[in-house]
């Protein structure tokens, strides 16, 4: 019961922290405050709009704030030992080191043609450490050691590439004239299961996908909203492992509605989310 209270407390303060991140990260015109890289000769090189570069630089930009938040909240941060490890950060309670929270930093961009939607996130593996929860393969601590699994996310708009010249070098006195590669950054924090979809996040890899409606992400309205984390765990641990026969054909269960029906539950417990980038509810 004490751990449940600690988890609720951590969730509350992490959400509050996410609301403060706009200060210092975005300029008054809503552009990202980071303009580029500076060398020893005071030359500024603009940042590429490549999502991996933006994600890494934004992570570096946020890290001092994260350290301050952890220290002021009674936690210490343990970073992942390897790049492909889950999670990005482990928050360990200073009072009780057995209390740990996984926090993954997630960034994605709004779709220019459908600004109510984003490109989505991958929410970690549904194989390996997710299934074998007492083992330490590709994870900082065993999955079961964590009292909660959280996302600290950023959704941003890409700046029109016509206003950015990645080959140009600026002098420091021209800093204010540099157009940032991203703008309109919105930060949020939630538990991982709250924004999960029932579909994989990236091709053939065993990653959990997120919902893509920005409104639903910010509200935590994933497909498991009516069901909770236990159903999220159960579904994704069994994703693609169960075969059913429909109309004489066999197929694997890869939809939550089918999984609920297979288990003898009302398929309508799976929340309907906006999957279509053109809008409108789709299952």
Predicted regions and their residues:
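Conserved active-site neighborhood of enzyme catalytic/cofactor-binding cores
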Residues: 104
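Nucleic-acid endonuclease domains
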Residues: 1-80, 84, 94-98, 107-283
């Amino acid at each position: 019961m004490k751990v449940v209270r600690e988890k609720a407390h951590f969730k509350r303060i992490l959400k509050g922290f996410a609301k403060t991140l706009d200060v210092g990260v975005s300029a008054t015109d809503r552009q990202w405050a980071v303009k580029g890289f500076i060398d020893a000769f005071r030359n500024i090189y603009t940042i590429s709009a490549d999502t991996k570069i933006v994600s890494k630089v934004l992570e570096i930009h946020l890290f001092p704030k994260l350290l301050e938040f952890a220290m002021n909240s009674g936690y210490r941060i343990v970073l992942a030992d390897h790049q492909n490890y889950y999670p990005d950060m482990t928050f360990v309670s200073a009072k009780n080191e057995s209390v740990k929270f996984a926090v993954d930093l997630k960034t994605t961009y709004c779709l220019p043609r459908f600004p109510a939607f984003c490109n989505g996130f991958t929410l970690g593996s549904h194989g390996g450490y997710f299934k074998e929860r007492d083992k330490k393969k590709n994870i900082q601590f065993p999955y079961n050691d964590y009292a909660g699994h959280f996302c600290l996310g950023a959704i941003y708009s890409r700046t029109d590439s016509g206003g950015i010249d990645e080959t140009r070098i600026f002098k420091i006195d021209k800093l204010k004239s540099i157009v940032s590669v991203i703008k309109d950054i919105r930060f949020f924090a939630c538990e991982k299961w709250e924004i999960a979809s029932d579909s994989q996040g990236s091709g053939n890899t065993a990653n959990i996908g997120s919902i893509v409606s920005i409104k639903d992400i910010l509200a935590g309205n994933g497909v498991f909203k009516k069901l909770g984390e236990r159903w999220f765990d159960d579904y994704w641990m069994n994703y693609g492992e169960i075969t059913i026969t429909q109309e004489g054909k066999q197929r694997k269960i890869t939809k939550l509605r089918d999984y609920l029906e297979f288990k003898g539950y009302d398929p309508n417990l799976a929340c309907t989310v906006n999957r279509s980038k053109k809008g409108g509810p789709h299952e």
